[in-house]
Amino acid sequence: MVFLKKSLLLVLFVGLVSLSICEENKREEHEEIEENKEKAEEKRGWMSKIASGIGTFLSGMQQG
């Protein structure tokens, strides 16, 4: 009976440790995805500013 209790505790402990590791990996992946989204949005913002600047420059050259 004592052997079964120890075995059960060991199985529960190993299960909790592996669950904790999985949660940590999932959290890291989620943070990485969010970081990539932020970088992509930042790039889009810069590209639109550059395109707007080029458009303004070209329209100024046509008028002048």
From Swiss-Prot:
Tissues expressed in: Expressed by the skin glands.
Record key words, sorted: Amidation, Amphibian defense peptide, Antibiotic, Antimicrobial, Cleavage on pair of basic residues, Immunity, Innate immunity, Secreted, Signal
GO terms for cellular component: extracellular region
Keyword match Ribonucleoprotein: no
Propeptide: 23-42
Glutamine amide found at: 63
GO biological process: defense response to bacterium; innate immune response
UniProt main location, coarse: secreted
Domain of life: Eukaryota
Pfam families for the chain: FSAP_sig_propep (PF03032)
Disulfide bonds: none
InterPro entries xref list: Frog_antimicrobial_propeptide
N-terminal signal peptide: 1-22
Compartments where found: Secreted
Family: Belongs to the frog skin active peptide (FSAP) family. Phylloxin subfamily.
Primary role: Antimicrobial peptide against the wall-less bacteria A.laidlawii and S.melliferum, the Gram-positive bacteria B.megaterium KM, C.glutamicum ATCC 27853 and M.luteus ATCC 27853 and the Gram-negative-bacteria R.meliloti 102F34 and E.coli K12.
The protein, known as: Phylloxin-B1
Lineage: Eukaryota, Metazoa, Chordata, Craniata, Vertebrata
Gene: PLX-B
